[in-house]
């Protein structure tokens, strides 16, 4: 057993429904086999367990590991393709790079960079958009297993309106998806996600095949994109006889508590009602929404309809792996949206980056650092004299220190990361 000594910040109680930031200065967390067995003032935990090893994390702040609910593994080398809206950006930047995943050696190199980037950003769990090629998804799961990340991913499928080399058929999509799920779902920390790219690029037959895979893989998730860009939404309405976007998935039984839909920048009230009633979650991807000019996310309307919301980096339309940056951009977005904006404080941002993500991904064992949870955590320790170190040192209280972390922090300030109490990154 190990006692971690430090200052711990987390959000076990949802700040959108009255919870506040939990702050425990000089606390002790007793961890055995990756699980937090006791938590209290360091002195008390030490007295009760005098013989255990101590890992001293003083001089920094310990947060739960981040949960990234939407990130594309084959797009890391496409980050920074600025200046285009979604459909043009896909054609110009994202899809040519995704086509390179046909070469499994190339995909393996990208997968290694991808898992390192996530871990370095303090992200311990992620719902990852895979590749259109089964072998590339296979190397992603292998790379994630080596590092030990908690990954949910799957084969991305499409059968129309993308470049030819990325298309599949409903039969092949079903067979390849099921084979990958049988190989990886529930193995180590890996889980499978059924992943049609978006209904723009998927026929009803393909979405029906996705539903069959979801049914045949208990505990799998469903993920896709929704209501991101006006031109995309108009095309989807044309293709599906004027339907609201969420219903293009819902009519196939793909929208429920297992579902995580990315973006939802321009939902109708009917879309929000269905998402709220079914318990589906939305991955809010604020830097991507700004970079592609997709729009300002209507958070207040999501909250009104009881829709679960968490954060996604959406690399490569998003601008990097750090959920600190996504939190700050989420805050900016609400400031800019006008009367409808929800004023986010630092507890909201931490919740969106941690516990909300764990909830969206169906991972009740992570998201905060309570007794009974797994020790998935990160130590933020900025370099001495850096603007963040100065800001944290002179903060009046922990909420203010946390706001400064979201404002000034980057992956460079993440000093160490643990999953199940195993040290990943230093
Ligand atoms: N919609 C369909 N594919 C994509 C993608 O790769 N990125 C984003 N942001 N939206 C999408
Ligand atoms: Zn995306």
Which sequence ranges carry the predicted segments?
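His/Asp/Glu-enriched, well-ordered alpha-helical/loop segment
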Residues: 251-258, 300-389
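Alpha-helical scaffold segments that flank or form the walls of functional sites
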Residues: 81-149, 173-186
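N-terminal metal-binding scaffold of metallo-dependent hydrolase/deaminase domains
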Residues: 1-48
């Amino acid at each position: 057993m190990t006692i971690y000594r430090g200052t711990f910040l987390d959000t076990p109680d949802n700040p959108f429904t009255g919870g506040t930031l939990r702050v425990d200065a000089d606390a002790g967390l007793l961890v055995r086999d990756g699980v937090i067995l006791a938590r209290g003032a360091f002195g008390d935990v030490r007295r009760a367990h005098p013989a255990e090893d101590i890992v001293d994390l003083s001089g920094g702040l310990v947060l739960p590991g981040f949960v990234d609910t939407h990130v594309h593994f084959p797009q890391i080398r496409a980050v920074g393709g600025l200046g285009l809206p979604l459909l043009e950006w896909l054609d110009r930047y994202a899809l040519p790079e995704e086509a390179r995943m046909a070469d499994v050696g190339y995909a393996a190199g990208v997968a290694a960079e991808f898992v390192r980037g996530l871990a370095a950003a303090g992200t311990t769990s992620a719902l990852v958009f895979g590749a259109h090629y089964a072998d590339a998804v296979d190397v992603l799961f292998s790379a994630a297993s080596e590092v030990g990340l908690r990954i949910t991913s799957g084969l991305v499928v499409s059968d129309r309106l993308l470049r030819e080399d990325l298309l599949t058929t409903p039969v092949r999509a079903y067979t390849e998806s099921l084979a990958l799920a049988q190989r990886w779902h529930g193995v180590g920390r890996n889980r499978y996600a059924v992943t049609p790219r978006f209904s723009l690029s998927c026929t009803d037959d393909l979405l029906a095949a996705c539903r069959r895979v979801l049914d045949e893989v208990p505990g799998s998730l469903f993920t896709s994109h929704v209501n991101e860009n006006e031109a995309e939404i108009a095309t989807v309405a044309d293709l599906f006889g004027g339907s609201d976007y969420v219903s293009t998935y819902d009519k196939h039984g793909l929208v429920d508590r297992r579902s995580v839909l990315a973006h939802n920048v321009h939902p109708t009230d009917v879309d929000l009602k269905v998402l709220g009633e079914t318990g589906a979650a939305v991955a809010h991807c604020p830097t991507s929404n700004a970079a592609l000019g997709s729009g300002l996310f209507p958070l207040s309307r999501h909250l009104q309809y009881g829709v679960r919301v968490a954060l996604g980096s959406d690399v490569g339309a998003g601008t990097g792996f750090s959920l600190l940056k996504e939190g700050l951009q989420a805050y900016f977005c609400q400031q800019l949206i006008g009367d409808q904006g929800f004023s986010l404080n630092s507890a909201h941002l931490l919740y969106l980056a941690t516990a909300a993500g764990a909830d969206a991904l169906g991972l009740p064992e992570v998201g905060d650092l309570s007794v009974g949870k797994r020790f998935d955590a990160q130590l933020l320790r900025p370099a001495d004299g850096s603007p963040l170190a100065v800001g944290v040192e002179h903060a009046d209280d922990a909420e203010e220190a946390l706001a400064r972390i979201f404002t000034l922090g980057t992956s460079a300030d993440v000093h160490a990361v643990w999953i199940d109490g195993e040290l990943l990154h230093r």
